[in-house]
Amino acid sequence: MAEGQSPENSPPAPPPPSPPSPPSSNDQQTTSPPPSDNQETTSPPPPSSPDIAPPPQQQQESPPPPLPENSSDGSSSSSPPPPSDSSSQSQSPPPPSTSPPQQSDNNGNKGNNNENNKGNDGSSGDGGNKNMSHTPPPPSKTSDHSSHSQPRSLAPPTSNSGSNSSSNDGLNIGAVIGLVAAAGILFIVMILLCVCCFRKKKKKSKLDQMPYYGSNAYPAGKTGGDQYYNQNAATQQQQHYNQNDHIVNLPPPPGSMGTNWVSSPPPPPPGNWQPMPSPPAPVSGGANVIQSGEMSSNFSSGPYAPSLPPPHPSVALGFNNSTFTYEELASATQGFSKDRLLGQGGFGYVHKGILPNGKEIAVKSLKAGSGQGEREFQAEVEIISRVHHRHLVSLVGYCSNAGGQRLLVYEFLPNDTLEFHLHGKSGTVMDWPTRLKIALGSAKGLAYLHEDCHPKIIHRDIKASNILLDHNFEAKVADFGLAKLSQDNNTHVSTRVMGTFGYLAPEYASSGKLTEKSDVFSFGVMLLELITGRGPVDLSGDMEDSLVDWARPLCMRVAQDGEYGELVDPFLEHQYEPYEMARMVACAAAAVRHSGRRRPKMSQIVRTLEGDASLDDLDDGVKPKQSSSGGEGSSDYEMGTYGAEMRKFRKVTLESRDYGASSEYGATSEYGLDPSSSSSEEMHIGGSTSKTTTTNRGI
């Protein structure tokens, strides 16, 4: 223990024991301390590493105390290193005095071991200083180097092991952090995907309820009118079609044949249910086109957003379930009262109705007893189930029962028809931007029917009174009662001629060959109405001139000199963009070409109206020649030909009606309470004036 305490007072103690040897040993040891210091300086890294690592090394060096015996037995160079190391360390107290912190850092046990080794080395060193006076230095150096090389060799592994462990820990921590971060990112991505899917489903449900409009004013739900509109949505989904105000000849609710409505036993509705003779009775079973003109888009239903109790439990999602009872529709229209009458025609009447949930609808009642009406009812429902477009009027539901009652329920459009604003008594002049918007919207709806539906759909009755307007004056094509399906591989469909005078394509009126170009011609006539403000026929001249015959040379003149004065509606007062007017005039002139092959597609007209195509694209390689009168000169067309053909066709149809060849011929009152005469022939029957759209509807 005295020796254990001597390290603190080690500087004075060493000189007395062996004055001669210390110098030599010290000299030799003095040379050794620097390396030892250097070795120690290299050894600090182990201490810097975990403090536990160095002690085991010292403890591993402490067990070799038997090594001194080996050193005493022989002065082998291999054995001395441990004792010499211990001796060098035992004789290095003075240097340790300068570096006690290092040894204190290494542990107190090391100093104690050095002191114990010092005593052993002292006894052995005293006996062998003379003999080993010169030899020890080399061994001591070698021993020092070897001894220190061992710790050096040991130290790096410990430091490496520490660094490896620390690096492993770092890698483990980094891996854990990476996994956590990846899991967090994956979780966030999954949440975002769920949110997106939810929004898409929500939007889809809204679109399903009101497929044509992005804004559905009615909350989706199964309460109140929501079920009703879900029916509509499902109806439109299954129908994939915006149901237009389609007039389908099907036995109307109460009425048998004839114009008078027979009071229907079923309806106990609120208003007095009376026969419908009140509306002006159409002439002998006339093929009057009932245009549910006010079929409103979903936009028009905005004010009725609050949901109310459903109209009837039978009203549920899906077209098959979007059926109404006759009592429900009679109640919605106040017993089909005259106050709710929107229009009448050869196939029945159109009334405005309000469902219990506040939704406004247009109810078309079809007359009973007509096989043609039944077929057209089925055709309209079939076609409506195939289409889905925001510029086509949508069908809400229908009523069909064993009593022969056939009713179609459409969305209600508040702004009536294009005909009403152009030729009716609206009291306002439609400005040019609105006219252009209506032309473009109806062109898109018609292009969808021709080019996006398979098989394609030919409307057969495009006219101003079948273009319905929502509260934003967005156009909706209506009335698919005459529409025909045409396979893509069919060049044309041979069918009975149906339509309205002034809009019929010449090849269709003369031969009954129906193609999508027949609709293009009718659309061209409607464009001329928007441009000129005139009707399709000139009633003042007893149909001597049609709008097509009158406007064609003016359109050609506009193309030459750019003068619109005679052609453009004077009520516009030059408030229009010349380049927009030029595009519409070019589209109209190309659409009413006498030859169907030379007319453009509806998609070409859409692009031209939007300004995405040049006017030359409408010609599609066709360069019309100029006649001396300024009209289009071609081998199959001469001035006045269209009007002459229409007069001939009218005569044939009127004669067939007079002889009773078809019960479907007759007078028509265009949609609306104040129908105009633009697309109808003025006829005086029994002292009363009614308008006839001589639609040839064969049995």
Curated annotation (Swiss-Prot):
Residues 100-121 have a biased composition (Low complexity). GO terms for cellular component: plasma membrane. It catalyses: L-seryl-[protein] + ATP = O-phospho-L-seryl-[protein] + ADP + H(+); L-threonyl-[protein] + ATP = O-phospho-L-threonyl-[protein] + ADP + H(+). Residues 148-158, 687-699 have a biased composition (Polar residues). Signal peptide: none annotated. Mostly expressed in flower buds. It comes from Arabidopsis thaliana. This is Proline-rich receptor-like protein kinase PERK7. Residues 336-615 form the Protein kinase domain. Glycans are attached at N70, N131, N164. The keyword Glycoprotein applies.
